[in-house]
């Protein structure tokens, strides 16, 4: 018989760190609220959620690593917005943040969720922070819930 393993979407007693970029705060505040909403809807209590603000997305991997290694959190959600401008800065930041977040997760075994918007325009970021395209902070929280439960079963 084939065994199927799936993560449930219940917070249980798990603890979550939300790492939120202050840069583009008009977007990241919405991502933060979306993530908190998702976690609370799925049973997380306020004392299970800790929000840490960092200057920008580029600083996320280091702080995510510190949080993941602390043993205090079952998952770390990285929430930010990198919006393309007229210089190659976007490409460097987006690449390094995504690589760094993935590396922290692999090195620590703690789910570190990439909830960083990488968009070509402010309009696209606004759409993904709670308007037309849903709220990617909410989606990141759902991924965190599922990953935490999935890891418990493997």
Curated annotation (Swiss-Prot):
Q: What is its EC number?
A: 2.5.1.78
Spell out the InterPro entries in the cross-references. Answer: LS, LS/RS, LS/RS_sf
Reaction(s) catalysed by this chain, per the record, are: (2S)-2-hydroxy-3-oxobutyl phosphate + 5-amino-6-(D-ribitylamino)uracil = 6,7-dimethyl-8-(1-D-ribityl)lumazine + phosphate + 2 H2O + H(+)
Q: Which residues carry out catalysis?
A: 89
Any one biological process term the GO annotation gives: riboflavin biosynthetic process
Instruction: State the disulfide connectivity.
Output: none
Q: Where does (2S)-2-hydroxy-3-oxobutyl phosphate bind?
A: 86-87, 128
One GO molecular-function entry: 6,7-dimethyl-8-ribityllumazine synthase activity
| Binding site residues for 5-amino-6-(D-ribitylamino)uracil | 23, 57-59, 81-83, 114
The record, for Pfam families, names:
DMRL_synthase
- GO cellular component annotations of the record: cytosol; riboflavin synthase complex
Q: In which pathway does it act?
A: Cofactor biosynthesis; riboflavin biosynthesis; riboflavin from 2-hydroxy-3-oxobutyl phosphate and 5-amino-6-(D-ribitylamino)uracil: step 1/2
The cross-references to CDD domains, in alphabetical order and at most eight, read: Lumazine_synthase-I
UniProt keywords, alphabetically: Riboflavin biosynthesis, Transferase
The protein's superkingdom reads Bacteria
Q: Which NCBIfam families match?
A: lumazine-synth, PRK00061.1-4
Instruction: Check the record and name the HAMAP family matching this protein.
Output: Lumazine_synth
How this chain assembles, per its entry, is: Forms an icosahedral capsid composed of 60 subunits, arranged as a dodecamer of pentamers.
Q: Which family does it belong to?
A: Belongs to the DMRL synthase family.
What does the UniProt record say this protein does?
Answer: Catalyzes the formation of 6,7-dimethyl-8-ribityllumazine by condensation of 5-amino-6-(D-ribitylamino)uracil with 3,4-dihydroxy-2-butanone 4-phosphate. This is the penultimate step in the biosynthesis of riboflavin.
Q: What is this protein called?
A: 6,7-dimethyl-8-ribityllumazine synthase
Q: What is the lineage of its organism?
A: Bacteria, Pseudomonadati, Pseudomonadota, Acidithiobacillia, Acidithiobacillales
Report the gene name.
Answer: ribH
